């Protein structure tokens, strides 16, 4: 029975030493590692940007179709920004009157 315990303790000691050795080596190498790439982050940002562009195009097209159904043959006025509540200027064309002022 003494030999079994001795072997178990030896295996445990080897496991602990190897574990320490692995971490010690990686901690020494860490400053010389290549920095992590931003490829994944950039891919997500590009996908989000183009999703927004496509969403805006679809929203504007639906707005135009709805306006043409109600006012056939007329020029579609500019669409007011959805998520921007501050002042905005229009240099060419006319801005849409807000709901409160049109009543």
UniProtKB/Swiss-Prot annotation:
GO cellular component, one term: membrane
Residues in coiled coil: none
Membrane-related topology note: Single-pass membrane protein
Keywords: Membrane, Transmembrane, Transmembrane helix
Subcellular location: Membrane
InterPro entries found in the cross-reference section: At4g29660-like (IPR037759)
Transmembrane segments: 38-58
Protein name: Uncharacterized protein At4g29660
The encoding gene: EMB2752
